[in-house]
């Protein structure tokens, strides 16, 4: 008798994607982050669903409803903090997943990579609108500052901002629509993630060497299911440790003050995972220039497959490219630190230099290093 997982129309799809999937035998733990992102998404959707049952998207009651969730709802506090810190874990996994893709040349799978870039934009949009919902000071002012950036668009900017706000300032209409967006976007992310996987199944997984591994494949289950379970346990352990011991470590204390349009916080800054882009935005004195740099800092990822000049796919055997990759990582950490600092003398110039280096590395230095490595291969 044939196994049901191989014959049933629905089970067959799941079987081909997660059980009998031929997988390279040498993929490292850096390949765990895809499944961890799936786990993060499930955690976020479930905790978010329970939070939405008690949350009220109204300017007069939003802040109080979050307080009510934490104080009066059974285990509301843990659901709320799992959701808030789950977002941080999501972005840690996302950046590690992208870094892996960049290092090992996974961007050669054009369709998979491009869907990934779209996914990144969608996740960032979801996190942004979600941060507005508690209606604290940083929620309100973050929403005001970031949406206001669109006013830099010539001719239609001001109209566009007022259209997004649903009025002449961030108010009840803005909060209601942001809640609607925050509820629907995770399901769009889920659909895009499935498309991402469909495109990946077309080509099969890459591996650390970047060399085709068709002659050396092993089934996904049990070898990589057990490996993914270990990664999942470590993720859950980290998330629970963060949630139970330091729930506010990555948040902003200003968000415990109810939103007040008449009082501006001393330092307006987004959550830590957006600080690198915020630093790039602030490092350009011109408003439109800053907005374009902000957009390009993420959109540049879509051009990476075109900027790949090396004859080798992976960076495993390319020392110059490896060095520049880690310089890029250090540069992004520097930008993240600068984004959280006030706009004054030493930080401004460091932020500007780090922003220049970011674009220089991706657009010039890394492609040139790859060309030099191509020449050295002939020696």
From Swiss-Prot:
Pfam families xrefs: Cytochrom_B_C, Cytochrome_B
TM spans (from-to): 33-53, 77-98, 113-133, 178-198, 226-246, 288-308, 320-340, 347-367
Binding site for heme b b566: 97, 196
Residues binding heme b b562, per UniProt: 83, 182
Compartment list: Mitochondrion inner membrane
GO molecular function terms attached to this record: metal ion binding; ubiquinol-cytochrome-c reductase activity
Annotated GO CC locations: mitochondrial inner membrane; respiratory chain complex III
PROSITE patterns: CYTB_CTER, CYTB_NTER
InterPro entries: Cyt_b/b6_C (IPR005798), Cyt_b/b6_C_sf (IPR036150), Cyt_b/b6_N (IPR005797), Cytb/b6-like_sf (IPR027387), Cytochrome_b (IPR030689), Cytochrome_b_C_euk/bac (IPR048260), Cytochrome_b_N_euk/bac (IPR048259), Di-haem_cyt_TM (IPR016174)
Co-factor binding comment: Binds 2 heme b groups non-covalently.
UniProt GO BP: mitochondrial electron transport, ubiquinol to cytochrome c
Topology of the protein relative to the lipid bilayer: Multi-pass membrane protein
Chief place where the protein resides: mitochondrion
Cofactor list: heme b
Keywords, alphabetical: Electron transport, Heme, Iron, Membrane, Metal-binding, Mitochondrion, Mitochondrion inner membrane, Respiratory chain, Transmembrane, Transmembrane helix, Transport, Ubiquinone
Tree of life domain: Eukaryota
Signal peptide: none
Subunit structure comment from the entry: The cytochrome bc1 complex contains 11 subunits: 3 respiratory subunits (MT-CYB, CYC1 and UQCRFS1), 2 core proteins (UQCRC1 and UQCRC2) and 6 low-molecular weight proteins (UQCRH/QCR6, UQCRB/QCR7, UQCRQ/QCR8, UQCR10/QCR9, UQCR11/QCR10 and a cleavage product of UQCRFS1). This cytochrome bc1 complex then forms a dimer.
Role noted for this protein: Component of the ubiquinol-cytochrome c reductase complex (complex III or cytochrome b-c1 complex) that is part of the mitochondrial respiratory chain. The b-c1 complex mediates electron transfer from ubiquinol to cytochrome c. Contributes to the generation of a proton gradient across the mitochondrial membrane that is then used for ATP synthesis.
PANTHER family assigned: CYTOCHROME B (PTHR19271:SF16)
Other notes: Heme 1 (or BL or b562) is low-potential and absorbs at about 562 nm, and heme 2 (or BH or b566) is high-potential and absorbs at about 566 nm.
Family as reported in the entry's similarity comment: Belongs to the cytochrome b family.
Name of the protein in question: Cytochrome b
